């Protein structure tokens, strides 16, 4: 009986983690004022990409953890507004 109860508790926690709690990520570009967005259901990471061009260092923030081209730095994280 104790084993069944423990299994039920673990399954409940896992299901709540999958369904609950959308991530909030910063989504401002370069030197713009801070803005945030609530990510789509199931998206649990934020990213910050940065690169240099003729305008200087540029940055982009958002939800997820995209692949990047060579020369672009990417940082991914998994707490709210961790990509500021």
UniProtKB/Swiss-Prot annotation:
Annotated signal sequence range: 1-21
GO MF annotation, one: toxin activity
Gene Ontology cellular-component terms listed: extracellular region
Presence of keyword Secreted: yes
Alphabetical keyword list: Acetylcholine receptor inhibiting toxin, Disulfide bond, Ion channel impairing toxin, Neurotoxin, Postsynaptic neurotoxin, Secreted, Signal, Toxin
Membership in a protein family: Belongs to the three-finger toxin family. Short-chain subfamily. Type I alpha-neurotoxin sub-subfamily.
Protein name: Short neurotoxin SNTX-1
Species for this entry: Demansia vestigiata
Organism lineage: Eukaryota, Metazoa, Chordata, Craniata, Vertebrata
